[in-house]
């Protein structure tokens, strides 16, 4: 479907907002990571043209649309009203802000989308679209920019342009004002800058982010105290242009924890390999390689097109499309029957 990438680019708008924070006045033009506040806990960067038509991306969006028909309907209307096509977008950054409150969850999401965009046209089509459902679009000055609020029922979306070809969107007003402000950005955050440097930033999709303390503590329990603490951060890169290549890194507190988590993960992978035989996915699981590298646990997998199709078939509830191959001797913890 032509509007799938528009949906992908705008998933962040579904996340509830959080408390407003102070912001400096509007800064110069901002785009990409330069628009992401230093307070962000995680970032996902997407090179849109390079993920178009990737089978796994296509499948993931299909599943999302099936499970969220309301989302599909809303973004179909956006596609029809605003003539958004996948080729409209060139580069998208999703940034997740800090979570507040005692309940588990994530912070507000900021979407920074760059492409063939025209502010007046986007504002006009959003106004027409929300107006059809009794909603409103209001515009208010924000320094030398305009902050738009689209409201329909109990749904609110804010957006503004960081520069002529870059729109910033969020369900949280403070996320927009902070992004446009002259305050520090994600590249000024030493931890996030360090973790982002560990990801393959040349990949079509890459991400880096801090791990929630509750998740870290949970992993200690899951491993029966084999690790002293869960990972401080996760980094990932994904290339689905030909087959699928995934590289995941868990940044541990020390090499001993990385080695302990390697042992635990290999044990879990061996059990998964056995279960995967029932779905003819032993060959796929066998491509997963696990190894500790100093304080980082690395998990890598490279699948060819046939293996990707096999995985998609299994995800759809069918058996694998190809015969499972037994894992070779000496594989990195992915041995299975």
Q: What are these model-predicted stretches?
A:
Residues 18-149, 153, 192-227, 263-287, ...:
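Structural boundary/hinge residues at secondary-structure and domain interfaces
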Residues 1-16:
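Sec-dependent bacterial lipoprotein signal peptides
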Residues 44, 149-184, 243, 289-307:
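A short, solvent-exposed beta-edge/loop patch
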Residues 227-292:
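Intrinsically disordered, low-complexity segments enriched in Gly and acidic/Ser/Thr residues
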Residues 39, 117, 143, 160-167, ...:
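Short, solvent-exposed coil/turn segments at beta-strand boundaries
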Residues 50, 115, 240-242, 250-256, ...:
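Beta-strand elements of well-folded, non-transmembrane domains
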Residues 32, 92-98, 155-162, 232-238:
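Short, surface-exposed beta-strand/loop micro-motifs that present aromatic residues
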Residues 96, 104-105, 141, 160-162, ...:
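Generic beta-strand structural signal
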């Amino acid at each position: 479907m032509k509007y799938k990438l528009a949906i992908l680019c705008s998933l962040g708008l579904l996340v509830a907002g959080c408390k407003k924070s102070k912001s400096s006045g509007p800064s110069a033009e901002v785009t990409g990571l330069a628009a992401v506040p230093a307070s962000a806990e995680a970032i996902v960067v997407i090179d849109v043209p390079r993920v178009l038509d990737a089978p796994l991306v296509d499948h993931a969006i299909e599943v999302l649309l099936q499970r969220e028909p309301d989302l599909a309907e809303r973004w179909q209307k956006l596609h029809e009203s605003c003539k958004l096509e996948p080729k409209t977008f060139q580069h998208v950054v999703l940034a997740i802000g800090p979570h507040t409150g005692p309940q588990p969850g994530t912070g507000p999401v900021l979407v920074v989308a760059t492409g063939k965009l025209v502010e007046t046209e986007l504002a006009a089509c959003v106004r027409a679209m929300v107006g059809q459902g009794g909603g409103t679009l209001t515009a208010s000055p924000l320094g030398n920019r305009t902050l738009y609020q689209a409201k329909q029922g109990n749904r609110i979306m804010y957006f503004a342009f960081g520069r002529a070809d870059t729109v910033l969107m969020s369900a949280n007003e403070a996320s927009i004002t902070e992004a446009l402000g002259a305050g520090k950005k994600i590249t000024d955050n030493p931890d996030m800058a360090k973790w982002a440097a560990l990801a393959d930033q040349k990949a079509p999709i890459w991400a880096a982010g801090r791990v929630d303390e509750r998740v870290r503590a949970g992993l200690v329990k899951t491993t029966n105290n084999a690790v002293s603490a869960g990972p401080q951060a996760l980094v990932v890169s994904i290339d689905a242009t030909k087959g699928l290549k995934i590289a995941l890194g868990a940044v541990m507190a020390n090499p001993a924890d990385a080695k302990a988590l390697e042992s635990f993960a290999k044990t879990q992978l061996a059990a998964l390999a056995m279960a995967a035989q029932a779905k003819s996915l032993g060959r796929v699981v066998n491509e997963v390689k696990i190894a500790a590298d100093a304080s980082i646990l690395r998990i890598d997998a490279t699948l060819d097109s046939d293996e990707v199709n096999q995985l998609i078939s299994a995800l759809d509830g069918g058996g694998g499309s190809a015969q499972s191959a037994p894992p070779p001797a000496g594989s990195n913890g992915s041995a299975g029957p």
